[in-house]
Amino acid sequence: MPIITLPDGSEKNYESSVTIEKIATDIGPGLAKAALAGRVNGNLLDTCIPITNDAEIQIITSKDNEGLEIIRHSFAHLLGHAVKQLYPEAKMAIGPVIEDGFYYDISYKDTFTPVDLEKIEKRIKELINKDYDVDVEVVSPAKATQVFSERGEVFKLDIIKNIPKDEIIKLYKHEEYIDMCRGPHVPNTRHLRAFKLMKVSGAYWRGDSNNEMLQRIYGTAWKNSKELKEYINRIEEAEKRDHRKLGKKLSLFHFQEEAPGMIFWHPNGWTIYRVLQDFIRETISKYDYQELKSPQIVCRSLWEKSGHWDKFKEDMFTTTSENKEYAIKPMNCPCHVQVFNQGLKSYRDLPIRLSEFGSCHRNEPSGALHGLMRVRNFVQDDGHIFCTNEQIQEEVQSFIDLVFEVYKAFGFNSILIKLSTRPEKRVGSDDVWDKSEKALSDALDSKGLDWSLLPGEGAFYGPKIEFSLKDCLNRVWQCGTIQVDFSMPERLNSSYIDVDGKKQPPVMLHRAILGSFERFIGILIENYSGNLPIWLCPLQIVVMGITDRNNDACLDTKSKLIKYGFRASVDTRNEKVGFKIREHTMQRIPFLIIIGDKEEENNEISVRTREGKDLGKMTLDKFKVIMDESISKKSLVESK
């Protein structure tokens, strides 16, 4: 006789086992129609699974975050249903939920084409319109093995092999199609409406290149057609802003097969890089960082001492010299510890803040490489703070100020903050963890910031704070981090003399603001669609004449602009001025200066912006004031 407690505290008594479907019906027909699943004593459950004991329950609908995930997972099974009807020889592998949608990995003899996707999408819509119930059966691994053996689903059998014999498996039945999943799933296809199949790509079974290459069909699904349309619009806008396309169009960088994951920076792109680096260098100097430079290639022995060799060697590029094995550094931290270790340190010397624009190499899988966002060679705006336990909070507070100062300069005002705390397997005493976690949370609270807690998500060697940016398309990019480390200083024999004259290992704070220069530049390019803030633009001004006889005045103006410290060029081509304006506007040049006979006569210039605004005629001195103000204030253009 289960007693069911609802979210408002009210109770319902039942004579025998009861389902979420029944409870929702008893509450009201509207809720019964909207119910997707239930949260029972904290666990999600299908609407048809019996509840036999007392329970606290919440009815899940599409309005809940869990509801959207259930819809997406159910769409993955519906995709499988459609594929098996159209291509009976296909073998189904896995179909999980991902950000904004779902995918299904499929083995099939022919390559799926855009025409195939259209056919599959059409069949999915037909299945939805049949408005059928999705049935659930709870079985043993042995029974599941029998079911999928009869169907020849080899990938399902491979999954079942690794499931303990005493566990249960849920089989979800879409008419004649059977799939397995933890669930829950929607009770009826009427809940599945707003979706679109997006693309097909390749993926190895279990991510192992020694296994079969499968075809991965991606889809997106939403609560309603309005949200779907908004998402499709965002995707289309993101494609227009793709930093790889703009990088080529604006001649910023390129990649080629001879150096996968390594960037060929063009002069324009390298200018952005250097300006960004100079800005970070200037900003962190106000926070008393000391910049250093550490070796690019370091002997295996140091990586063994630091613990990276055991955990990271597969991702390292290695080489040998004089019978010794070396690694190109994948991170900078062990090298920074070596700098700290030079000479005796007192508690009076702490904190010591070291920084480096450290070039790192990681042997990322070729399939994971993605423009500037995922590369094999990148430069971190890396920093390490050596301090005492008592100094952690103050150092974190200072870093928070630094992070927000930098992000504000680039127009990022929506910052998501997460605090990750101790995992089950960790080093250090509970007392040390208590103090360090409190130091981080107190630092965040002292700044009046909203933040979320991720229990158990910290590294084994200390808690951390992550800072993520939200761009103009509401995409979230994790960039900044500050990580407490109790382990590495001890592993690498770091110490300072405390107030009692005893040796103590310092606390090490790993911190980065941008993450990597390459990825951050990619984020900026996409956020601004190439229309970078004036101070960051590789070329800020182009001067052009209306006729050839104005060329000397243009060249003279360009020379003065360069002397003022601006990045300027001159266009003396024998082309119509309208053509030049259009071309340089397409190149995202912030200011275009036009000089004709009247401008020469009056010692003036005409100025246009890349947004098409005519600023009219003015003296060069007045234009210099506009430029100086824009650059000094780090003026931003609207992200459009």
Swiss-Prot record:
Q: Which reaction does it catalyse?
A: tRNA(Thr) + L-threonine + ATP = L-threonyl-tRNA(Thr) + AMP + diphosphate + H(+)
Matching Pfam families: HGTP_anticodon, TGS, tRNA-synt_2b, tRNA_SAD
Q: Where in the cell is it found?
A: Cytoplasm
Q: What class of enzyme is it?
A: ligase
**Quick one: which residues bind Zn(2+)?**
333, 384, 510
Cofactor(s) for this UniProt protein: Zn(2+)
Q: Which CDD domains match?
A: TGS_ThrRS, ThrRS_anticodon, ThrRS_core
* Transmembrane domains' residue ranges: none
Tell me which domain of life the UniProt entry assigns to the organism this sequence originates from: Bacteria
Q: Quaternary form?
A: Homodimer.
This chain belongs to the protein called: Threonine--tRNA ligase
